[in-house]
Regions:
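Active-site-adjacent substrate/metal-binding segments within catalytic domains
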Residues: 62
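Active-site core of metal-dependent hydrolases
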Residues: 154-183
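Flexible loop residues that form catalytic
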Residues: 10, 86, 159
Length: 183
């Protein structure tokens, strides 16, 4: 039981003084709670207890191989990072394998990068032109596969060289994402 905490519950309501009971590593009760006989009690000293924060534009992933505790993030209360920004991403299969083989102390979600799709469909040496219709179809197919494997969707970085020549490919990809029935 953690008593005397300033609870922010994530619902948007004002913080409040409360207690939180944890049983079997899960929150079981929240409120004005009294301790059970022989229950371990921690005085929260009025400190804030809040749900973990989500860093929706993170570049921490590369450092997690050297620091799986993710201390730069977890020390800030971040429990989930979202990667795949700026148009670049790892394939979902690679990401899943990496996280299975090298577990980290933080949740990781990913977008699929637009420039990554362009590179896979067009070849890295061909990025300095607009995509051909058959390459656009490949990009949509790759994006659909990645979303079925857990990608959050499409992310761009149009200010980066690999995306300078995108035009229809970006529009086509965003149309797919918005009309997609991928869960």
């Amino acid at each position: 039981l953690i008593q005397n905490i300033n609870l922010i519950d994530g619902t948007g309501t004002a913080s409040r003084l409360a207690s939180v009971r944890i049983m079997e590593n899960k929150i079981s009760e929240v409120g004005d709670l009294q301790s059970f006989e022989e229950e371990e009690v921690t005085d929260g000293q009025g400190k804030v207890l809040a749900p973990g924060f989500i860093d929706s534009h993170s570049h921490h992933y590369g450092g997690l191989s050297k620091n799986p505790a993710g201390l730069p993030a977890t020390n800030q209360g971040i429990t989930t990072i979202v990667i795949g920004q700026d148009g670049g991403s790892y394939p979902m299969d690679t990401l899943e394998s990496d996280l299975k083989n090298y577990p980290v102390a933080i949740n990781v979600a990913s977008y699929t990068g637009h420039s990554t799709l362009r590179g896979k469909a067009m070849g890295v040496k061909s990025l300095f032109r607009t995509a051909k219709p058959e390459e656009l179809a490949k990009m949509k197919g790759y994006l659909e596969q990645e979303m079925k494997k857990g990608s959050l969707g499409l992310n761009t970085g149009l200010e980066y060289e690999s995306a300078f020549f995108s035009n229809r490919d970006l529009i086509g990809s965003t149309n797919f994402v918005t009309s997609s029935n991928v869960p």
